[in-house]
């Protein structure tokens, strides 16, 4: 009986793996070196702009950790063209949502907007990359936020 059940489960796994259609995408490098993966999915009228940086906790001094996560937070503080505290306001007032996370080997930011706002998502991520403003008030604010988050994880 166990052989029959095991065989059936194996068959289901095989059917689900081989039955999946190939996800089509374009992949290329821009002149500035940025690697782009572009995928169209018309199942919902939204666009996601996602940027992944190949930097994370692995790049830190093991005796002083937390900087990658701290910088993830710091890059929401504002840019030359997005005033401090306005990042989330711009996203939500345009019907969007966003978030970020950091792992050992990467830092990932994304925005999801209605599909007619692809330019806004691209502009915001280019602002984060090219024109961030890092000042003492942002450092102090995000330091407190990260400390509070760490406390929540420990509790």
Go through the PLM ranges and name each one.
Residues 5-7, 18-88, 110-113, 117-126:
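His/Glu-rich zincin catalytic helix
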Residues 53, 79-80, 86-155:
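Acidic/histidine-enriched segments that form metal/cofactor-coordinating
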Residues 11:
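Acidic, glycine-enriched active-site microenvironments
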């Amino acid at each position: 009986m166990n052989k029959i059940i095991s065989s059936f489960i194996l068959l289901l796994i095989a059917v689900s793996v081989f039955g999946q259609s190939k996800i089509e995408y374009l992949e290329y490098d821009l002149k500035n070196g940025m690697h782009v993966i572009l995928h169209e999915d018309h199942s919902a009228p939204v666009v996601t702009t996602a940027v992944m940086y190949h930097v994370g906790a692995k790049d830190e001094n093991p005796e002083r950790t937390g900087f990658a996560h701290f910088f993830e937070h710091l890059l929401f503080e504002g840019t030359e063209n997005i005033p401090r505290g306005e990042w989330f306001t711009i996203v939500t007032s345009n019907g969007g949502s966003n978030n970020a996370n950091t792992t050992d080997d990467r830092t990932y930011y994304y925005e999801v907007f209605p599909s007619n706002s692809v330019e806004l998502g691209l502009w915001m991520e280019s602002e984060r990359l090219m024109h961030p403003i890092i000042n003492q008030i942002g450092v102090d604010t995000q330091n407190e936020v990260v400390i509070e988050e760490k406390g929540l994880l420990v509790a």
